């Protein structure tokens, strides 16, 4: 049901935006209905057509505490959508001839080690970003969640060998966050820039995303940023 609702929302927004003129009033009403349907405090919507922003608006509130309204400039965390930035960044290095998708991870991170010696030696950059490590959904997530603990990417690399597989390598799609943390470390070692520095200087800034930051900790002005919320049982 959740997927159907999301699909319907996307289709409706697309249908409202295919014309040269955006029907802002209908779109506003749709977003308001969406807020009620999903029971969320706020949402930001942006539509780009032919390289131009034709709709940008915040709806609802950014915090249940202060009740301040969302607007088109409110900073919102993108969570796992950041994985797309990681893949894009790695692809830039591949295009530049500095990296290959089928490079062994140990070529760039010699201390990398998984649950099995053979798997460790065969594991590639492609494996890191295609969720086929063989480890279970959510395996090792407590190494970096909740945000604010003192674990680093080096700690993840050191401890990922203790995570047990639930399937053989490349046999199944099993979503795993830690492999992307390690992919970020590959990016750092090949480019000489931290993941955050690369994302901001090579991707965000060149396309005008100067108001965006690669992580919450890099946001210096927090006067217009959302609070994280969760439903109380």
Question: What would you call each of these model-derived segments?
Answer:
Residues 1-3:
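N-terminal secretory signal peptides that target proteins for export/translocation
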Residues 5-14:
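Sec-dependent N-terminal signal peptides
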Residues 15-19:
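N-terminal signal peptide c-region/cleavage motif recognized by signal peptidases
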Residues 22-76, 100, 158-164:
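Short, conserved catalytic-motif segment at the N-terminal edge
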Residues 28-31, 45, 51, 59, ...:
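Active-site SXXK
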Residues 59, 117-233:
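Short, surface-exposed loop or secondary-structure junction motifs
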Residues 101-116, 206-207:
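Short, glycine/proline-biased beta-turn/loop segments that scaffold the active-site neighborhood
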């Amino acid at each position: 049901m959740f997927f159907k609702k999301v699909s319907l929302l996307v289709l409706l927004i697309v249908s409202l935006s295919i014309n040269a003129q955006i029907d802002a009033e209908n779109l506003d009403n749709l977003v308001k209905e969406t807020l009620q349907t999903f029971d969320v405090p706020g949402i930001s919507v942006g539509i780009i057509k032919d390289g131009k922003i034709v709709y940008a608006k915040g709806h609802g509130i950014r915090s249940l505490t202060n009740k301040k309204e969302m607007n088109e400039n409110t900073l919102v965390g993108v969570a796992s959508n950041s994985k797309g930035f990681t893949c894009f960044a790695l692809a830039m290095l591949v295009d530049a001839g500095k990296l290959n998708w089928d490079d062994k991870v140990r070529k760039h991170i010699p201390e990398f080690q998984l649950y099995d010696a053979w798997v460790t030696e065969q594991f590639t950059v492609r494996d890191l970003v295609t969720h086929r490590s063989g480890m279970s959904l959510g395996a090792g997530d407590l190494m970096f969640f909740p945000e604010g603990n003192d674990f680093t990417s080096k700690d993840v690399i050191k401890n990922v060998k203790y995570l047990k597989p639930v399937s053989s390598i490349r046999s199944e799609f099993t979503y795993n966050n830690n492999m992307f943390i390690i992919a970020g470390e590959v990016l750092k070692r090949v480019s000489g820039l931290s993941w955050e520095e690369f994302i901001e200087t090579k991707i965000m800034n060149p396309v005008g995303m100067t108001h965006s930051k690669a992580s919450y900790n890099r946001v210096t002005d927090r006067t217009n940023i959302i609070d994280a919320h969760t439903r109380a049982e």
